[in-house]
Amino acid sequence: MAAKEVKFGDSGRKKMLAGVNVLADAVKATLGPKGRNVIIEKSFGAPLITKDGVSVAKEIELKDRFENMGAQLVKDVASRANDDAGDGTTTATVLAQAIVNEGLKAVAAGMNPMDLKRGIDKATIAIVAELKKLSKPCTDTKAIAQVGTISANSDHSIGDIIAEAMEKVTKDGVITVEEGSGLENELSVVEGMQFDRGYLSPYFINKPDTMVAELDSPLLLLVDKKISNIREMLPVLEAVAKAGRPLLIVAEDVEGEALATLVVNNMRGIVKVAAVKAPGFGDRRKAMLQDIAVLTGGTVISEEVGLSLETTTLEHLGNAKRVILNKENTTIIDGAGVKTDIDSRISQIRQQIGDTSSDYDKEKLQERLAKLSGGVAVIKVGAGSEVEMKEKKARVEDALHATRAAVEEGVVPGGGVALVRSLQAIEGLKGDNADQDVGIALLRRAVEAPLRQIVANSGDEPSVVVDKVKQGSGNFGYNAASGEYGDMIEMGILDPAKVTRSALQAASSIASLMITTEAMIADVPEDKPAGGGMPDMGGMGGMGGMM
């Protein structure tokens, strides 16, 4: 086991504070509409230029191990805020730095760290409750566009395209961000339910010019097993042929004789048919088949529920207005499912999203929810170079997270004003003793830090602006982009309440733990021997007689 170095008390805390300040100073330069860029060296390719706080934080590793511990803890603050609300990483970092700096001064002055922590916790709970009171619902497209614009560093084109995407696919829809090929941002929306499985045979194609198979007003046969024997399908195929409607088969697989017979029937025009593999694997496949069944008003043919292909009738089949299959995807448009059944399925999936702790499962459930409720929108980011593309894509993703958070918990005045206004919640707040009162006062000063930093980055005097904002009330604040004072909501400067809340909670949680640190343990760096020289060759002297 490697030897350890231990630092106690003030000497350890000073090192930790130095690390906190290095990381926070790099990150906070990006805050606000006039935040600066940070350039990050990459091991290959061009350096990365970014104004994204979490991208800056992720890159920082310090040589001194004790300083690095402080930096990594603040990095954790940024990650927590990002995981919870998808944005607010820079605000969380600025708050954490302010709380740690103020807190460690109080500890050095002889205050009890545990009481300071209790005071900070008490004040945080009161401010979070006040933020919830200050928040206004965010439902209209204009407000959503404003939130997206602010989060994307005042880029109106990003805010507008996100608002348009949300309007088209609803708040439950999936919006994905991809790299585009042009200079402008583009939005494409997939209507209906799409899943990533294409036709099983190119012989199903009936539109050779676009290489797709299109079925108008089809019936859907949903089967939870492999189909290889055509005989078991004959009754249902005959019934479909009599009905004179096309048929889409969605099964675990269709192979061998069954696939060949379907192709022949399709080419001869006996039954217009197409077959596709069911999306997903294992239990997820069963769930997605059930989703398609609910959406189209059909029944999944599964031995688990006592149904077999031989006994399948037209009543078991789903209905849709149209189905389009290409090589990679299948889209079901306007399924004939009962609305109450679809709503019930949606609420069931929402419940599962709330219950699961796995990010992967959550993402897959969110996709299923979107396919049932809204649809899928793809934002293609346009840029003039690869470096600009990476930077812009990160901003679009941030803005997308921020708008989702705004729809979820509402919006508050932006530009650090909401935190300053929420101070009224702790005006008369008292702790159980004098040290807890210091903890409350400490947080009162710290929550001004984001506003101060936004003003500093815009080149103005922080103290003057903070005093003027404090003298105002309601939504009155400072627009750093234009240098004007006024109503932040009317000026379109909004922050999602969830982002502000998550930033404060993450910052006060980690910062108060750092204040109560008494010992720090790190590995002692090993002295590696200088390489390059050959080992001692002294034993070669006896070779002289070989001449």
Curated annotation (Swiss-Prot):
GO terms for molecular function: ATP binding; ATP-dependent protein folding chaperone; isomerase activity; unfolded protein binding. One of its GO terms (biological process) is protein refolding. The keyword Isomerase applies. InterPro entries: Chaperonin_Cpn60_CS (IPR018370), Cpn60/GroEL (IPR001844), Cpn60/GroEL/TCP-1 (IPR002423), GroEL-like_apical_dom_sf (IPR027409), GROEL-like_equatorial_sf (IPR027413), TCP-1-like_intermed_sf (IPR027410). Pfam families: Cpn60_TCP1. Its EC number is 5.6.1.7. The keyword Magnesium does not apply. It catalyses: ATP + H2O + a folded polypeptide = ADP + phosphate + an unfolded polypeptide. It comes from the Bacteria. Keywords: ATP-binding, Chaperone, Cytoplasm, Isomerase, Nucleotide-binding. ATP binds at residues 30-33, 51, 87-91, 415, 479-481, 495. One of its GO terms (cellular component) is cytoplasm. It is found in: Cytoplasm. Together with its co-chaperonin GroES, plays an essential role in assisting protein folding. The GroEL-GroES system forms a nano-cage that allows encapsulation of the non-native substrate proteins and provides a physical environment optimized to promote and accelerate protein folding. Forms a cylinder of 14 subunits composed of two heptameric rings stacked back-to-back. Interacts with the co-chaperonin GroES. Belongs to the chaperonin (HSP60) family. This is Chaperonin GroEL. It comes from Pseudomonas savastanoi pv. phaseolicola (strain 1448A / Race 6). The lineage of its organism: Bacteria, Pseudomonadati, Pseudomonadota, Gammaproteobacteria, Pseudomonadales. The gene is groEL.
